[in-house]
Amino acid sequence: MPAERRRQVLVSLGLVAATFAAFGPVLRAGFVNWDDAANLLANWHYRGLGLAQFKWMATTSFGGCYQPLSWLSYDLNYLFWGLNPLAYHLTNLVLHAANAVLFYLVARALFRLGAGEADETRVSIAAAFAALFFAIHPLRVESVAWVTERRDVLSGAFYLGALLFYLRREIKASLACFFLALLAKASGLMLPAVFLILDVYPLRRLSINIREWLSQRCRPVLLEKIPFFILSAVFGVVALAGQRGAGALVPL
C-alpha cells in the first residue's frame, strides 16, 4: 500500500476510534424525552416497507420537516431491531464517525488546493486535526445523542459527499449526493452558493470579479450549477411549507 494511502487509512481509523470514545456512552442511553416519543415511539406511520409507509414518508412534513430519507433510516432500524434504542443510537454514531472521515477528506482536499506545493504530510496533519475538532466538538452531541436529529448526521454525510465529489470535479456524483442530503434534511440548501465560493478560491474556476462571470470562459461553470439551484429552490419551498404547516413560522 502506498505511504499516502496508508496515512489516510490510519487517520480515518483514528478518527473513528476517537468518535466512538467520545460518544460511546450514548449507546447506553434510551430515547431522548424531547421529540423521540412523538416521532418514533408513538408514530406507527413509518414502520414497514409497504406502499402506505413509502407514501407517508414521501409526502409528510411531520413535525415541520420534510425528511423522507431519514424516515426510511428509522424504518430500517425498526424492521431489524424494533424499538431498541441501542440500534438507533448506534446508527447515529456510525453516521457521525463516517462524517468525521468525510470531513477529513474534504479538509485534506481543500488544504491541498490552497497550499499548492505544500508537503503532503503537513496537509494530512492539518486535515486530521480539523476533522478531530469536528468529530469530538460538544456541539455535535445533540445530533448524535438525540435520535430525532438523525436527519442532521444523515444529511451531513451526503452534504460532505457532495463537497468531496465537487472538489474532485465529479459533478454528477455531487448532484446525486446533494439530492440525497436534501431528502434527509433541507439544511444544506445553500450548498450551491458554497460551490460558487469554492470556484473563486481555491479552485480558481471563477474570477473574484463577479462581472467576469458572464464571460464565455465562466459560462460552463455557472451552467453546471443550474440543477443544484433548482433542487435548492424546490426543497426550499417544500421546507417552508412544512414549517408553516407545523406552525413554526410566526410573524416578527
Segments predicted by a language model, with ranges:
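Polytopic membrane enzymes that build or remodel cell-surface glycoconjugates and lipids
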Residues: 1-252
